[in-house]
């Protein structure tokens, strides 16, 4: 790899030729603020927050798209740079809905954080036209509020990366806004509910539809028996909501928090995952032995199912007919568990804590109520659960570790790997191979299906 010699804030540095100034400064331990940049996904220099000074250049340049070259001298924190960034933030705020106190992203908003860092107050020097912005709450899983949109286009890039492209930049000039084709509401376009636009939005312009109030209402209803079950990935992501290190396993504290929120039973979705493993393995064996449609594709992701329905309907016969662990858990709770406990299913409210907004859509599908009742009534994201715990005044870090309730709190290690790429297929293969061979596996690992080739 060819290297070039540059200086960043008078500090000499050798970096690969052709990388952006932003990448070079990060290699040097210097952070340049951005609002639109997503590496290899959205490198368009739209927000203009990352402007830096380059010796010999007539104007400031955008660090995220400007390549380094031999002898370049870069300055990231001059008075000219700071003034430019502050003015850009003021201009963004001039047309921004500044209802920060009631915004779901208050405290985690990237725009809010940068305004704080650069001393930009709520008043501002500029007064924008503040046009009427679209507010779209038609979808089951999310809300779009263009009043908080800063036109960074991260959501557009994320949607394109998923090969969906249901949102884009509409109109031109000052009237430019993010929307779907022909300004159609989200519930009438081919959105797969994956939520990647939500994850990548730097502000509160796109966010998950909050069902916490409905869940709390059910908890406070003495006639309702409210059961919650949590996906395997939640236990290693929830801690981030409370300032804990990324990936910290907080399973015990999560269970304790859910009990303190008032849930009657706290179960593990891994139990449903084990059921899914057995069902999918048997379905696969049935297809192999009876000349069924092959290859069989696992179907635990409702976003993947919706993607297939919209874009590849000819592949639907290849999908496993098994429900996802979320829905299997709900179905078991409202049938077998209800019968064992002597509870009328109509009085049971099942809540799933899931990592994906597509799970919200899944709970409302017509084919997910075979017992006459919805398998799962509400699906909450990690963020929603985090807000519930905070609003209840629960000091999460100081909670004791507690265990899931039996019997739907027990599971195998195969269920846990559902949270990893290829985990569903690998878990099903373990069962299928043992059934075909009649022997216990010597090795549980099927690394070929993990999708890590080339990584």
Q: Where are the predicted features?
A:
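Iron-sulfur-associated redox domains of electron-transfer enzymes in respiratory
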Residues: 5, 12, 17-81, 208-455
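Residue-level recognition of oxygen-bearing side chains
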Residues: 20, 154, 196
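Fe-S ferredoxin-like electron-transfer domains
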Residues: 48-193, 206-225
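Intrinsically disordered or highly flexible coil/loop and linker segments, enriched in small
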Residues: 97-98, 109, 120, 124, ...
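Structural motif corresponding to the C-terminal cap of alpha-helices
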Residues: 163, 201, 337-341
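Phosphate/diphosphate-binding loops
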Residues: 195-210, 259
């Amino acid at each position: 790899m060819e290297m070039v010699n540059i200086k960043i804030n008078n500090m000499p540095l050798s970096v690969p030729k052709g990388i952006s100034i932003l990448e070079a400064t990060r290699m040097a331990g210097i952070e340049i603020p951005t609002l639109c940049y997503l590496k290899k996904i959205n490198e368009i220099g739209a927000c203009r927050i990352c402007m830096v000074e380059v010796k010999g250049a007539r104007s400031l340049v955008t660090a995220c798209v400007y390549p380094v070259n031999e002898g370049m001298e870069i300055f990231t924190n001059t008075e000219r740079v700071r003034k430019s960034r502050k003015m850009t933030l003021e201009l963004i705020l001039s047309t921004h809905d500044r209802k920060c106190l009631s915004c779901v992203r208050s405290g985690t908003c990237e725009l809010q954080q940068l305004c704080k860092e650069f001393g930009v107050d709520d008043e501002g020097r500029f007064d924008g036209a503040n046009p009427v912005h679209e507010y779209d709450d038609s979808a089951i899983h999310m809300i779009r509020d263009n009043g908080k949109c800063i036109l960074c286009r991260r959501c557009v890039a994320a949607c394109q990366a998923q090969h969906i492209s249901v949102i884009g930049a509409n109109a031109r000039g000052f009237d430019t806004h993010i929307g779907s084709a022909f300004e159609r509401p989200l519930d009438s376009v081919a959105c797969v509910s994956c939520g990647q636009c939500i994850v990548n939005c730097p502000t509160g312009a796109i966010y998950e539809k909050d069902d916490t109030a409905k869940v709390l209402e059910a908890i406070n209803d003495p006639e309702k028996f409210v059961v919650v079950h949590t996906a395997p990935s939640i236990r290693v992501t929830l801690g981030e909501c409370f300032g804990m290190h990324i990936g910290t396993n907080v399973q015990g504290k999560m269970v304790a928090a859910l009990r303190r929120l008032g849930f009657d039973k706290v179960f593990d979705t891994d139990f449903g995952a084990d059921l899914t493993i057995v069902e999918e393995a048997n379905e696969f064996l049935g297809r192999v032995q009876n000349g069924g449609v092959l290859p069989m594709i696992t179907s635990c992701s409702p976003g993947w199912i919706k993607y297939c329905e919209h874009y590849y309907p000819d592949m639907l016969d290849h999908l496993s007919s098994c429900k996802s662990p979320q829905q299997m858990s709900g179905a078991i709770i409202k049938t077998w568990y209800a019968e064992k406990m002597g509870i009328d299913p109509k009085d049971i409210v099942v809540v799933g804590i899931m990592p994906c907004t597509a799970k919200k859509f899944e709970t409302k599908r017509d084919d997910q109520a075979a017992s006459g009742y919805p398998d799962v009534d509400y699906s909450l994201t990690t963020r929603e659960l985090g807000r519930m715990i905070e609003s209840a005044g629960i000091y999460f870090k100081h909670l004791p570790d507690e265990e899931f309730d039996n019997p739907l709190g027990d599971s195998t290690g195969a269920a846990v790997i559902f949270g990893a790429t290829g985990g569903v297929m690998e878990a099903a293969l373990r069962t299928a191979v043992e059934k075909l061979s009649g022997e216990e596996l010597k090795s549980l690992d099927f690394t070929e299906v993990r999708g890590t080739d080339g990584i």
